Amino acid sequence: MQPPLLVLSVYLLWLKYCDSAPTWKETDATDGNLKSLPEVGEADVEGEVKKALIGIKQMKIMMERREEEHAKLMKALKKCKEEKQEAQKLMNEVQERLEEEEKLCQASSIGSWDGCRPCLESNCIRFYTACQPGWSSVKSMMKQFLKKIYRFLSSQSEDVKDPPAIEQLTKEDLQVVHIENLFSQLAVDAKSLFNMSFYIFKQMQHEFDQAFQLYFMSDVDLMEPYPPALSKEITKKEELGQRWGIPNVFQLFHNFSLSVYGRVQQIIMKTLNAIEDSWEPHKELDQRGMTSEMLPEQNGEMCEEFVKNLSGCLKFRKRCQKCHNYLSEECPDVPELHIEFLEALKLVNVSNQQYDQIVQMTQYHLEDTIYLMEKMQEQFGWVSQLASHNPVTEDIFNSTKAVPKIHGGDSSKQDEIMVDSSSILPSSNFTVQNPPEEGAESSSTIYYIVAKVLQHFKGHFKTW
């Protein structure tokens, strides 16, 4: 018998003397009735060690699979970070071009803007867009246009939103480094635990059947014929690619050609043309009748005011034409660059969000792996601690004492057994209670006490 098995079997020999007689002097009289106790104990010890070694092997296999998943996540993080940096670079380039164009436009076209603004802010435009059927969205678009154009050309305009701070990227990088360090240490601990358990396996190899030896020494990628008794949560298999698809962020956005400013230019010209076509001086029409037909009831008062100011509105045509020319000729690049900047900023935000999501998935994967490894180690890791003990020899049997507790001088009432284990475990002793309504020499009592001793021994070595 190999040393690790002897370490456990020594307890069983204690029980041999404890249960075989009421007192130590009467051992010879009853020893023959309990010769099966060490044999039962050895069989149970072998079964427990075998079960624990199976769990350690399964733990190693699971950790290797988790390492593959972790490597995929780290690869996705690296790719996403590169894409995020590309998006940031693109936004910075567009922002630089936009700032240059804005400076040139501000310096050269202040006068043109002063002539354009009255057209856009005039009551004629507001009245017409509120009264003419089919133009309900023009008013909001005009407000949006005014807000954006003031932002470009007014000296009091708000600054463009700054790109994400470098400090934020640094925090994210530190978090990823922390995750990588923790996972690497977890992998090292799992490998070390398996190595110590493998040492125990080699010492007890001849005690195991051939099938178990082939399984424990087989490649981890082969089918496991001895799966440990674990919960469904631990044994559940999920492919990383099925849970977490990592799209390419540069496929999310394209075609920057759509511009709100082009639509506003068209609205201005259509409005001017509609005013001119509808209110020709030589046309003799019943203006009130036309108004009642073409204008909505809820805007009746506003539309009547529009009719009264018709002559004044026609005078604004030249100014609005100048405004149209200004938008299309004097600062043609500013609106388009602004749209490109907004799209680039959106791309940066999406890439940052995606990067954060992958970081969160990696963090969850780490925490889930730690949880699974702790549960498996708690159940099976005790067997690896046998490797840290010196070889057990026959002399250790003589250095251990087990004393039955006798109540009231009645030797038949041995309900407790005190075991002195100071030569093996740091704790000096522990107590095993006999099961109620069972005799000291019954088979059920033997199995019960063996199980209690094994439970005490395994509990002592549950560390990590």
From Swiss-Prot:
- Identify the InterPro entries for this entry: Clusterin-like (IPR000753), Clusterin_C (IPR016015), Clusterin_N (IPR016014)
Q: Which cysteines are joined by disulfide bonds?
A: C105-C331, C116-C323, C119-C320, C124-C313, C131-C303
Asked whether the keyword Nucleotide-binding is assigned, the reply is: no
Chief location bin: secreted
Q: Please give the GO cellular component terms listed in this UniProt entry.
A: extracellular space; nucleus
Residues carrying covalently attached carbohydrate according to the record = N195, N255, N309, N349, N398, N429
Q: Which residues form a coiled coil?
A: 56-109
* Family from the record: Belongs to the clusterin family.
Q: What is the protein name for this chain?
A: Clusterin-like protein 1
